[in-house]
UniProtKB/Swiss-Prot annotation:
HAMAP family: Glyoxalase_2. This is Hydroxyacylglutathione hydrolase, mitochondrial. The gene is HAGH. Keywords: Cytoplasm, Hydrolase, Metal-binding, Mitochondrion, Transit peptide, Zinc. Monomer. The keyword Mitochondrion applies.
């Protein structure tokens, strides 16, 4: 057991890269080690006629996403913390990787950028923060990018970090659902911690920006936090049937090693307490009548929430 663990640890450290390793703190190294215990997590392909998304588990509970334009076979990678795994997926799909879409600068999202650009030269690296490694173009709110024939709109959603970007992907003249890559702003049934922002900023990010997207938009978030998020959601709204049903579904998926990603914007409004801060049931739980104050109250509660085992 120990020997296998050390071998896996060595593999993990090689995957992370020496530069990122030197910058990593104890918590980061722990996550690199723990990801070896989660290697049974399965990848998943979400295929549409115009775009394909390969869901790539990384580290302990992270997700990377290979976005493929089916028309041109051009691809972008979202948050490539494990570069070799990314390149293996690129080879598997027979596509040309042209760009990196970085949601934010945290090491478990941007920590693989510098190694990836050395392994695959000529990549364009996008992000909304100068702290993003190997950055070639800093983007801002509503900056437009292209991945083959796909349109990518940058949505500035500061709060988790001040330079956080979500990437909204559409295909012109298509009736298929768009996709949005939300990093650590919006999770399934949750949201990111307010490390560099305020409840007002998260309200704007979730309700006014992401919440105004096409309801059928598929949400690809940065972490597999779904079960714990839904347990907190159940605590906030114990009589919400949508939460109960989603939790049972998520447990079954997790037990089989499958991702619970993607959700949709419409679904998030039914079970995500941070998307439901205008609902009376959530406000009553928080003891507030204002949605922004409710956002702050339930985030503070979530930060100290002890997740039940059931």
């Amino acid at each position: 057991m120990l020997g296998g663990g050390w071998r896996s640890l060595g593999t993990a450290l090689v995957a992370l890269g020496a530069g990122a390793l030197l910058r990593a703190g104890p918590a980061q190294l722990r996550a690199v080690f723990l990801h070896t215990e989660h290697e049974q997590r399965k990848s998943k392909t979400v295929a549409q006629a115009n775009m394909k998304v390969e869901v790539l588990p990384a580290l302990t509970d992270n997700y990377m996403y290979l976005l493929i334009d089916e028309e041109t076979k051009e691809a972008a990678i979202v948050d490539p913390v494990q570069p070799q795994k990314v390149l293996d997926a690129v080879k598997k799909h027979g596509v040309k990787l042209t760009s990196v879409l970085t949601t934010h600068h945290h090491w478990d999202h941007a920590g693989g950028n510098e190694k990836l650009v050395k392994l695959e030269t000529g990549l364009r690296v996008y992000g909304g923060d100068s702290r993003v490694g190997a950055l070639t173009q800093k983007v801002s709110h509503l900056t437009s990018l292209k991945v083959g024939s796909l349109n990518v709109k940058c949505l500035c959603t500061p709060c988790h970090t001040s330079g956080h970007i979500c990437y909204y992907v559409t295909k012109p003249n298509s009736s298929e659902p768009p996709a949005v890559f939300t990093g650590d702003t919006l999770f399934v049934a949750g949201c990111g911690k307010f490390f560099e922002g305020t409840p007002e900023e998260m309200y704007r990010a979730l309700i006014e920006i992401l919440g105004s997207l096409d309801p059928e938009t598929r949400v690809y978030c940065g972490h597999e936090y779904t079960i714990n998020n839904l347990k907190f959601a159940r605590h906030v709204e114990p009589n919400n049937v949508s939460i109960q049903e989603k939790l049972a579904w998520a447990k079954a998926k997790y037990d089989s090693g499958e991702p619970t990603i993607p959700s949709t914007i419409a679904e998030e409004f039914t079970y995500n307490p941070f998307m439901r801060v205008r609902e009376k049931t959530v406000q009553e739980h928080a003891g507030e009548t204002d949605p922004i104050r409710t956002m702050g109250a339930i985030r503070k509660e979530k930060d100290n929430f002890r997740v039940p085992k059931d």
